[in-house]
Structures are given as C-alpha cells and as structure tokens.
C-alpha cells in the first residue's frame, strides 16, 4: 500500500527538557493526562476529566468524560521506547481522515532530551479543510506541546 504524498507541509515543533531520554518518553506517553490541557484542548470541555495514551502499539489515545464515556483521539501505530512513538490523530474528524503525529526523543546529554513533534498527512482530510486544520494545529501544538508538555517535563530554554 502506498503512503499518501505529503503535499501540505507537516507541522514541526521541538522542545528540550531536563529529563533523561527514558524519562521524557515516559512522561509524554504514560503521564498524558497530567500535562494535557483539557480545559482548553478537549472534545468535551467541562465534561472532560482525563486524557489517556495506552502505552503500547495498538494502544488507544482518548479523552474520558465525567459520565464514564470515552472519546477517541487516535491510536498508537509505532511504539519504540525510549526513542519514538507514532500515532494516528483524528480529534473531531472521522478515523478515515486521521493525520499522523510522530514524536522523536533524542538524548542531548544523560539529563537532557530534545523532543521533536511532526504532525503530518493532512491530505487524508476530505475537501478543502486540510490547510485550515493544519494551521489550527500549528498554533495549538505551541500551547499543548511546547508550553504544557514542556513545562511539565522541565523545559530548557535554548
């Protein structure tokens, strides 16, 4: 099966954190609900009580609501601790329009890690909305990834 041709540039972000590579990977994947900003970036708004990434290939990424229901964000496609995780992403879109998010964790030193995010495959979205959605995520990942995850993991200013 052929991979989609990336005609729309991916969103890329990078943050350095004062954590070992293994710790940075673990904080991103296993502590997802501790740093994800549900109040501003969720499907359910006030109803959202947790965000979860099941730490394994095939694991679900989802939001839990106060009534116990689960609302999917995506699925873990590649699980390579502590180096890389790739997952589908279809928040607010049908699963067949999923984009893809890759996180790479590179040790800068034993106590510092560069975490790089690439959000790609916008072409899976139908109609003309892909470019607009990409721009929203370009801004959104600044808050979610750089600010929230970065602060949670001990962001190091470059």
Task: Label every PLM stretch briefly.
Residues 52, 62-112, 120-123:
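Hydrophobic-ligand binding "helix-grip"
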Residues 24-28, 61, 76, 87, ...:
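Hydrophobic pocket/interface hotspot
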Residues 13-17, 76, 103, 117-119, ...:
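A structural signal for short, well-ordered beta-strand segments
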Residues 1-48:
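Hydrophobic ligand-binding cavity/cleft-lining segments
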Residues 17-19, 55, 78:
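Conserved strand-loop elements at the edges of beta-sheets that form or border functional pockets
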Residues 7-9, 57, 68, 97:
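Residue-level preference for beta-strand/loop junctions
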Residues 31-71, 82, 158:
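Short beta-edge strand/loop motif at the mouth of beta-sheet-based domains
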Residues 121-158:
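A conserved amphipathic terminal alpha-helix motif
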